[in-house]
Amino acid sequence: MSGDAQPSSNQRATEARPPPSPPLVNEKAAIGALCVVCGDRACSHLYYGVAACHGCKCFFWRTVKSRLNYVCRYGGNCSISTAGRNACRYCRFHRCLFVGMKIEAVKMDRKLTKRKKEKTDEDDTDDGGSHESFETTTDAKRAKFDNSLLISSLQLIDKTSSAGNAKLSTLHFVQPSLQNLLDEPELLDGFRSEMSYRATRQADEQLCYDSERRLVTWAIDWCRQTAEIADVHHTNDKISLLRASCAPLVLLELGCQSSFGPSDTQIPFCNNSFLSAHCIPPSTSFLRWKTIQSLNKWAQRELKPLCLRAKEIVLLKALIALNPDANGLSSDAESSIRMLRERVHTALFQLLMENSEPITAASRLAQILLLIPQLSLMGVDVIEQVKVRNTFNKRSAFGEGLLFWQLYGDIFDDANDDSYLEHSASCSPTDSQYTTDSI
């Protein structure tokens, strides 16, 4: 029947009102009841938001998809029922809208169908492109897996370096070289206590020494294990990495703990003690007052607003430990370190991309990388303080602070070789206190 067909006389009405509901039909009919448009038996599930029969569903879909316009010559008051639902398409369509059928549902369905068709056409007409796309996807998945494995390895290094393993150490009886410490990590077992930053008491001279030993041991473990991941096995190369990154690594660890802590004026140590930015530290501390203030300010202004996640911190530590510009690196070690550092960069950016939009991820990556030169500058202050302390305090140089002495020497010795061993042999105190309780 045509769209402008005249309905029968019993379909006409004289009052201007919405199309009446079909007899015995509830507009909120349950699924499987009657069609809310014409009163016919509805299908077993909703169509476009309402219970409708197959005929009304197809009529509504076809009208919306084809953008058809109908005209009613009798005022839009035709009754829509099972017997006469095709008599006036205008009233039938408006009845569909009145009972709640959603036009946007048809448009969404049309878009999905179009996308599926376009995807099928691309697959049929561009087999080469599909193969390349598959290879690209496979490479991306492999790279993502490799990055995840790298992050897991670095997290394990951080966990084992911070864990407690305090056994009797032979360092109480000998003064080994850095080469001995890197070749035989068990020599430092006596100083691998559990690292805890609860900051319950002000650090005195002895607590500063204890924390210093533990932090340097932690840095040694970090550098040694990251070098092994990079396939750098020569001990001299490991020593070069350690000297270049020990101070920045320690400062990053202390800065992160300061930003996490409840106080914004304290630098917590790993033995539950702390130094205050408002108090002058002990004269034998490896951190001078100016460095404490700078570190505290940096932690509160730079680190705290960033809210670094655990994985981001681990990757930042790896970037610091993997310094390809460290003095004394062999060419092979420099190349290996640089390659692993690039992998860490990629893993960090991938991690940021998983949590934010590309622009935000790129901006956050830049903010994180800018932390490294700031740490390096503060690290220079630490090294200068250690050298001055080692020059005028024999207990620091050859007893409690032996590890830092081996790394940086004093103002007369830059500790680039093992000359500090000869110097320590001639200048070590004869008091048995330092030979039995050294470091």
From Swiss-Prot:
Annotated spans, Disordered: 1-22, 112-135
Q: Which InterPro entries match?
A: HNF4-like_DBD, NHR-like_dom_sf, Nucl_hrmn_rcpt_lig-bd, Nuclear_hrmn_rcpt, Orphan_Nuclear_Rcpt, Znf_hrmn_rcpt, Znf_NHR/GATA
Q: Which SUPFAM superfamilies match?
A: Glucocorticoid receptor-like (DNA-binding domain) (SSF57716), Nuclear receptor ligand-binding domain (SSF48508)
Q: Which SMART domains match?
A: HOLI, ZnF_C4
Stored CDD domains? NR_DBD_HNF4A
- Give the molecular function GO annotations: DNA-binding transcription factor activity; RNA polymerase II cis-regulatory region sequence-specific DNA binding; zinc ion binding
Where do the NR LBD domain residues begin and end?
Answer: 173-408
Q: Where DNA binds (residue ranges)?
A: 32-108
Q: Which Pfam families does the record cross-reference, listed alphabetically?
A: Hormone_recep, zf-C4
Q: Name one GO cellular component term.
A: nucleus
Alphabetic keyword roster: DNA-binding, Metal-binding, Nucleus, Receptor, Transcription, Transcription regulation, Zinc, Zinc-finger
**Compartment list:** Nucleus
Tell me the domain of life: Eukaryota
Q: Tell me which residue ranges form NR C4-type zinc fingers.
A: 35-56, 72-96
Q: Locate the compositionally biased regions of type Polar residues.
A: 1-13
What does the UniProt function comment say about this protein?
A: Orphan nuclear receptor.
> What family name appears in the similarity comment?
Belongs to the nuclear hormone receptor family.
Could you tell me what this protein is called?
Answer: Nuclear hormone receptor family member nhr-97
Give the source lineage, highest ranks first: Eukaryota, Metazoa, Ecdysozoa, Nematoda, Chromadorea
The encoding gene: nhr-97
